[in-house]
Amino acid sequence: MSQARIIDGKAFAARLREQVAAEVAVLKAEHGLTPGLAVVLVGEDPASQVYVRNKGEQTLAAGMHSETHRLPANASQAELLSLVDRLNDDPAIHGVLVQFPVPDHLSQAAIVAAISPDKDVDGLTVVNAGRLASGLPALTSCTPAGCMVLLRDVVGDLTGKRAVVIGRSNLMGKPMAQLLLAADCTVTIAHSRSRDLPAICREADILVAAVGRAEMVRGDWIKPGATVIDVGISRFPSRDPVAAAAGKTRLVGDVAFDEAKEVAGAITPVPGGVGPMTIAMLLANTVSAAKRLNGIAE
């Protein structure tokens, strides 16, 4: 059997960002509206700083208004919620995102609950989760929404496909399953405690791995010809001893890529697969939120 098609998330994301920029230009020209995204960063987690910087740069590149609000690691819950309230009320801001993780003394659940559902571009509030589950228009979590863009291009019509999602988080696993269900897939949600997980995975025409365990999904778990979407991301020392000694690292997904590509029909690499789609979908969600908040048809 020939090797799997490698799904180029960077190329898809670049096209999506171009589409978003074109939509933004139309909103500015026809409605005098500039979509605005505010990102809140608490503390100085290095990975979060990189993510936040990338979000800001890509927001500006799409012609949108970008704000980054930085709070110290010892900021109180009240300070953070006060900032979120101000952003909820700011008519120039259409998307509000708090970069997680936050320091341990802060309640992630309370933070999510404070974000206006109309500006919840991460799709985490119970209102958006409920709307998604009910088949109503919703702001959908960016990573699963990006996965669906990839799947629709690679697979085409998803009707009747057997889909297995490994992972049940509110940010990824649950909304991914809802989106697949809405596309008329037959969906199984599995997780690290599922019995005989390899056998469950072998039934899948579409396998989405989002469990957070490096290379847990082996090649012999995959149905020949299946489409594999690897959402996991773990960091390990470089295989090159010199590079490792210098602190260089490599990124690894939840799927044993070298094994899986010999069996799957198509597969996303890590890095360069799902990751680039996440920020592109964040921009798309912000444009959607701006349109809805201003009564503009999508």
From Swiss-Prot:
Q: Where are the transmembrane segments?
A: none
What reaction gets catalysed by this protein? (6R)-5,10-methylene-5,6,7,8-tetrahydrofolate + NADP(+) = (6R)-5,10-methenyltetrahydrofolate + NADPH; (6R)-5,10-methenyltetrahydrofolate + H2O = (6R)-10-formyltetrahydrofolate + H(+)
Provide one Gene Ontology cellular component.
cytosol
Q: Where does NADP(+) bind?
A: 167-169, 192, 233
Gene3D superfamilies tied to this protein: Leucine Dehydrogenase, chain A, domain 1 (3.40.50.10860), NAD(P)-binding Rossmann-like Domain (3.40.50.720)
Q: Which UniProt keywords apply?
A: Amino-acid biosynthesis, Histidine biosynthesis, Hydrolase, Methionine biosynthesis, Multifunctional enzyme, NADP, One-carbon metabolism, Oxidoreductase, Purine biosynthesis
Q: In which pathway does it act?
A: One-carbon metabolism; tetrahydrofolate interconversion
Question: What Pfam families does the entry give?
Answer: THF_DHG_CYH, THF_DHG_CYH_C
* PROSITE patterns assigned: THF_DHG_CYH_2
Q: What processes does the entry annotate via GO biological process terms?
A: L-histidine biosynthetic process; methionine biosynthetic process; purine nucleotide biosynthetic process; tetrahydrofolate interconversion
- GO-annotated molecular function: methenyltetrahydrofolate cyclohydrolase activity; methylenetetrahydrofolate dehydrogenase (NADP+) activity
Q: Write the Enzyme Commission number(s) for this entry.
A: 1.5.1.5, 3.5.4.9
- What family name appears in the similarity comment? Belongs to the tetrahydrofolate dehydrogenase/cyclohydrolase family.
Q: Describe, as the record does, how this protein assembles with itself and its partners.
A: Homodimer.
The protein's matches in PANTHER family, at most eight in alphabetical order, are given as: C-1-TETRAHYDROFOLATE SYNTHASE, CYTOPLASMIC (PTHR48099:SF5), C-1-TETRAHYDROFOLATE SYNTHASE, CYTOPLASMIC-RELATED (PTHR48099)
**Function, please?**
Catalyzes the oxidation of 5,10-methylenetetrahydrofolate to 5,10-methenyltetrahydrofolate and then the hydrolysis of 5,10-methenyltetrahydrofolate to 10-formyltetrahydrofolate.
Output this protein's name: Bifunctional protein FolD
Instruction: Record the organism.
Output: Caulobacter sp. (strain K31)
Organism placement in taxonomy: Bacteria, Pseudomonadati, Pseudomonadota, Alphaproteobacteria, Caulobacterales
